[in-house]
C-alpha cells in the first residue's frame, strides 16, 4: 500500500487547466510503472492548502473517479492547514471540512487527513462531534510535531487516551495517521529496528482501541534532530532518523515500519514536495528502489 504525495504543481502537464488532479495521478501511475514499483496509494489536495478554497473542478471529479477505479488506487486527501475543528473558527471550519468529505465520497477518495492540535483530547473530541460522518470516508488524525506542549500525541499513552475518548463517544470513521518525521520531532527515537519495534509493539497492543484498518502512515525521514519540534521532511535514509543505517537498512527503524505496514496492509505515503519535477522523480526513484529491496 505504498505511494506518494501527488502535487499537481509537480506532476501535471504544463498548461493543464481543468483536470489537473486526474492528469497528475495519470503521470504518477505511469512513473510508478516506469521505475518498477506500481503504486497502490496516493495523497492529493482537493482544497487549499493554505486557504479554505475547493480547488477540484467538476470535470476533474468525474475523471478522477474513473482514474481511481481503473488503477484500483487507495487515495487520501490532505485537509487544508485551516482544517482545525477544535479552533475558535470551528463553525466555518466544520462546514468546510464537511464539503471536503462529501467531495471525497463523490470521487472515490477514502479519507481526509487533519492535523492534530496540541490540545486536550476532550477538545479534539468536541470538535470532531460537530462533523457529520460520511460513509466510506475516514478522518485520519495526523500525529503533530511539537516540542514544548503537553499533548504531543506521539506517545502511545496519549494516542490511547484520545482514541478511547473517540470510541466511548461513539464517533465513527475516525482513524490515525502516523507521520514518522513528526513523532521523531516530538521526541520519539525510532532510528533503530529495536527502538521502532518497541513503539510499534505498543501500537499493536492498542489495536482494540485503534485497529490497523484505520491506521495510515506518512513515511518520512527528518532533516532535524530528535525532539527538535521542527517539521522538515527528508528522503528516506537521507535524514537524521535513518541516514546512519543507509548501509545496514534491515537494522533500521524504517525496516520495522515497513514490516508493520505490510503485515497490517496499511497505506503509507511518502511526502516529498521538491523544487522541480525532475528533482522529485530522482528522489522518489531512489526511495522506492530502497523500499522494493526491503519488501523482498
From Swiss-Prot:
Q: What is its EC number?
A: 3.1.21.-
Disulfide cysteine pairs (residue numbers):
16-20
Which Pfam families does the annotation name? Answer: AP_endonuc_2
Q: Where in the cell is it found?
A: Host nucleus; Host cytoplasm; Virion
UniProt induction comment: Expressed in the early phase of the viral replicative cycle and accumulates at later times.
Q: Name one GO cellular component term.
A: host cell nucleus
Knockout phenotype, as recorded, reads: Decreases the growth rate of the virus to 2-4% of the parental virus in swine macrophages.
Q: How is the cofactor bound?
A: Binds 3 Zn(2+) ions.
Write out the residues that bind Zn(2+) 3. Answer: 182, 231, 233
UniProt entry tagged with the keyword Hydrolase: yes
Q: Give the main location.
A: host cell
Residues binding Zn(2+) 2 are 115, 142, 218
Top-level taxon of origin:
Viruses
Q: Which GO terms describe its molecular function?
A: 3'-5' exonuclease activity; DNA binding; DNA-(apurinic or apyrimidinic site) endonuclease activity; endonuclease activity; phosphoric diester hydrolase activity; zinc ion binding
Annotated residues that bind Zn(2+) 1 are located at 78, 271
Keywords attached to this entry: Disulfide bond, DNA damage, DNA repair, Early protein, Endonuclease, Exonuclease, Host cytoplasm, Host nucleus, Hydrolase, Late protein, Metal-binding, Nuclease, Virion, Zinc
> In its UniProt record, which GO terms are filed under biological process?
base-excision repair; viral DNA repair
Cofactor dependence: Zn(2+)
* Family of the protein in this entry: Belongs to the AP endonuclease 2 family.
**Function noted in UniProt:** Endonuclease of the viral base excision repair system that catalyzes DNA cleavage reaction at the apurinic or apyrimidinic sites (AP sites). Cleaves phosphodiester bonds on the 5' side of AP sites. In addition to endonuclease activity, the AP endonuclease has a proofreading 3'-5' exonuclease activity that is considerably more efficient in the elimination of a mismatch than in that of a correctly paired base. Displays 3'-phosphatase and 3'-repair diesterase activities. The single nucleotide gaps generated by the AP endonuclease are filled by the viral repair DNA polymerase X and the DNA ligase.
Further information in the entry reads: Consistent with its intracellular location, ASFV encodes its own replicative DNA polymerase and three base excision repair enzymes: a class II AP endonuclease, the repair polymerase Pol X, and an ATP-dependent DNA ligase.
Q: Please state what the protein is called.
A: Probable AP endonuclease
User: Which organism is this protein's natural source?
Assistant: African swine fever virus (strain Badajoz 1971 Vero-adapted) (Ba71V)
